[in-house]
Amino acid sequence: MKQQKDASKPAHFFHQVIVIALVLFVSKIIESFMPIPMPASVIGLVLLFVLLCTGAVKLGEVEKVGTTLTNNIGLLFVPAGISVVNSLGVISQAPFLIIGLIIVSTILLLICTGYVTQIIMKVTSRSKGDKVTKKIKIEEAQAHD
């Protein structure tokens, strides 16, 4: 009797690396055809999200590698820090402008995040409220029968 492969069983680590590498490779190809500049890593994140949502890629096929990468994310930011050090000449020319830009962009990010969160909360509370209202109406209709 043949054993069927369990779909919920996590894939081997090497298989997970290959899946993520293929997604990144496809995103690099997509990046080369895009009319606007967009990092392949961002395209890859969106592509992987779509693949996970559609079920084309199962969570078990990327979970272990994703967790490992997330746990070591500080190490992955070292190249970005080194490139900032290489740009100290540019930063030293207009430090107040750069600090101001950082402050303004942080405030705008917080405001936008707050508004988006409020919109999502309103939409989800309406849908939950509609379900509760329908349930109450059904119970009232059954009580009158």
UniProtKB/Swiss-Prot annotation:
Cell compartment(s), UniProt: Cell membrane
Transmembrane segments: 10-30, 33-53, 72-92, 96-116
Transmembrane helix among keywords: yes
A Gene Ontology BP annotation from the UniProt entry: programmed cell death
Membrane topology: Multi-pass membrane protein
Keywords for this protein: Cell membrane, Cytolysis, Membrane, Transmembrane, Transmembrane helix
Domain of life of the native organism: Bacteria
One GO cellular component term: plasma membrane
HAMAP family, A to Z: LrgA
Family listed: Belongs to the CidA/LrgA family. LrgA subfamily.
Function: Inhibits the expression or activity of extracellular murein hydrolases by interacting, possibly with LrgB, with the holin-like proteins CidA and/or CidB. The LrgAB and CidAB proteins may affect the proton motive force of the membrane. May be involved in programmed cell death (PCD), possibly triggering PCD in response to antibiotics and environmental stresses.
Protein name in UniProt: Antiholin-like protein LrgA
